[in-house]
């Protein structure tokens, strides 16, 4: 079987950076190291990080189970903000816990937050093309000074109140063509709309590469990554739009040899939070068929 691997499959630089920052603290013996929610949306990678003393914590409201000594900051547990970023309010709360605080927000997400903050202070409302339940979008809404709206469709735009001045951005992992369509619709709807294309280059590259796999002769596409990873789900959706059988899996164990043997050429891609070892295992299994 011939396996066509997408050029940009796997970790983006923002995810690599967040993992490196977190691991550095763990390897210094600074344990436990906490992350505010899952560092990345990949269960297998989170399990590996857990073995290294890196613990995911949820939306806890007190210091009850975390020992902190304000007089010895260098000896305290470390709290790492994940790549998706957080709101200013959340940042202040985490800092108030007294742990050593480290921000691993992806710089691309930080740029989006900066654009929102700047224009919110100038009186602009903010429209974010994104999933209102995704941690990145939740964090970005915190910079809008209470005038932020998450949308995913023209109907969502139609439901917005009358807005005079709008700053429009995108969650970094969304579809390029949808953002272009909705930003143009917003321009027709509101008096002044400043549009900033904030879909990150890693997302664009991965989406472009999926289309390229179809053009290179792939008869089916395997997309590797967490089922809760927004960018991986988008890749799988885009692969299906190429009218190719598409298999969204997390590990090689999910591949059905009988199903895969129907094809002689298979394209393989992976989300920005998928580690290399998972991609290699899938490619090896396919090539052995």
Swiss-Prot record:
> Active-site positions, per UniProt?
136
Q: How is the cofactor bound?
A: Binds 1 [4Fe-4S] cluster per subunit.
Which Pfam family, just one, is annotated for this protein? LYTB
Q: Which positions form S-S bridges?
A: none
Enzyme class, UniProt record, top EC level:
oxidoreductase
Q: Which residues bind isopentenyl diphosphate?
A: 41, 84, 134, 229, 231, 273
GO: which molecular function terms? 4 iron, 4 sulfur cluster binding; 4-hydroxy-3-methylbut-2-enyl diphosphate reductase activity; metal ion binding
Q: Which GO terms describe its biological process?
A: dimethylallyl diphosphate biosynthetic process; isopentenyl diphosphate biosynthetic process, methylerythritol 4-phosphate pathway; terpenoid biosynthetic process
Q: Which residues bind dimethylallyl diphosphate?
A: 41, 84, 134, 229, 231, 273
Q: Which domain of life is it from?
A: Bacteria
The protein's required cofactor(s) are namely:
[4Fe-4S] cluster
Reaction(s) catalysed (UniProt annotation): isopentenyl diphosphate + 2 oxidized [2Fe-2S]-[ferredoxin] + H2O = (2E)-4-hydroxy-3-methylbut-2-enyl diphosphate + 2 reduced [2Fe-2S]-[ferredoxin] + 2 H(+); dimethylallyl diphosphate + 2 oxidized [2Fe-2S]-[ferredoxin] + H2O = (2E)-4-hydroxy-3-methylbut-2-enyl diphosphate + 2 reduced [2Fe-2S]-[ferredoxin] + 2 H(+)
The pathway to which it is assigned is: Isoprenoid biosynthesis; dimethylallyl diphosphate biosynthesis; dimethylallyl diphosphate from (2E)-4-hydroxy-3-methylbutenyl diphosphate: step 1/1; Isoprenoid biosynthesis; isopentenyl diphosphate biosynthesis via DXP pathway; isopentenyl diphosphate from 1-deoxy-D-xylulose 5-phosphate: step 6/6
Transmembrane stretches in the record are none
Gene3D superfamilies hit by this protein: 3.40.50.11270, 4-hydroxy-3-methylbut-2-enyl diphosphate reductase, catalytic domain
Give the residues the record marks as binding [4Fe-4S] cluster: 12, 106, 200
Q: Which residues bind (2E)-4-hydroxy-3-methylbut-2-enyl diphosphate?
A: 41, 84, 134, 172, 229, 231, 273
The UniProt keyword set, sorted, is: 4Fe-4S, Iron, Iron-sulfur, Isoprene biosynthesis, Metal-binding, Oxidoreductase
**Assigned EC number:** 1.17.7.4
Functionally, this protein is described as follows: Catalyzes the conversion of 1-hydroxy-2-methyl-2-(E)-butenyl 4-diphosphate (HMBPP) into a mixture of isopentenyl diphosphate (IPP) and dimethylallyl diphosphate (DMAPP). Acts in the terminal step of the DOXP/MEP pathway for isoprenoid precursor biosynthesis.
- Could you say which protein family the record assigns here? Belongs to the IspH family.
Protein name per the record: 4-hydroxy-3-methylbut-2-enyl diphosphate reductase
Which gene specifies this protein's sequence? ispH
């Amino acid at each position: 079987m011939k396996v066509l691997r997408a050029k940009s499959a796997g970790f983006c630089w923002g995810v690599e950076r967040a993992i490196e920052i977190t691991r550095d603290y763990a390897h210094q013996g600074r344990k436990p190291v906490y992350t505010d929610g899952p560092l990345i949306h990949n269960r297998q990678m989170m399990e590996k990080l857990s073995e290294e003393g890196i613990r995911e914590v949820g939306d806890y409201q007190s210091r009850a189970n975390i020992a902190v000594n304000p007089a010895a900051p260098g000896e305290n547990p470390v709290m790492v903000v994940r790549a998706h970023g957080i709101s200013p309010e959340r940042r202040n709360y985490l800092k108030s816990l007294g742990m050593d605080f480290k921000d691993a927000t992806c710089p691309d997400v930080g740029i989006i937050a900066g654009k929102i903050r700047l224009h919110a202070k100038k009186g602009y409302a903010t429209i974010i093309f994104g999933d209102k339940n995704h941690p990145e979008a939740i964090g970005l809404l915190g910079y809008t000074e209470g005038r932020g709206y998450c949308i995913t469709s023209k109907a969502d735009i139609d439901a917005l109140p009358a807005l005079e001045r709008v700053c429009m951005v995108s969650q970094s992992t969304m579809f390029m063509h949808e953002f272009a369509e909705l930003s143009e619709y917003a321009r027709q709807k509101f008096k002044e709309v400043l549009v900033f294309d904030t879909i990150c280059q890693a997302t664009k590259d991965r989406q472009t590469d999926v289309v390229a796999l179809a053009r290179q002769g792939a008869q089916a596409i395997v997309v590797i990554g967490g089922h809760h990873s927004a960018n991986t789900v988008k890749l799988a959706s885009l692969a299906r739009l190429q009218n190719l059988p598409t298999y969204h899996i997390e590990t090689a164990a999910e591949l059905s040899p009988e199903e895969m043997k129907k094809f002689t050429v298979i394209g393989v891609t992976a989300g920005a939070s998928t580690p290399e070892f998972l991609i290699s295992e899938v490619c090896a299994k396919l090539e052995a068929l």
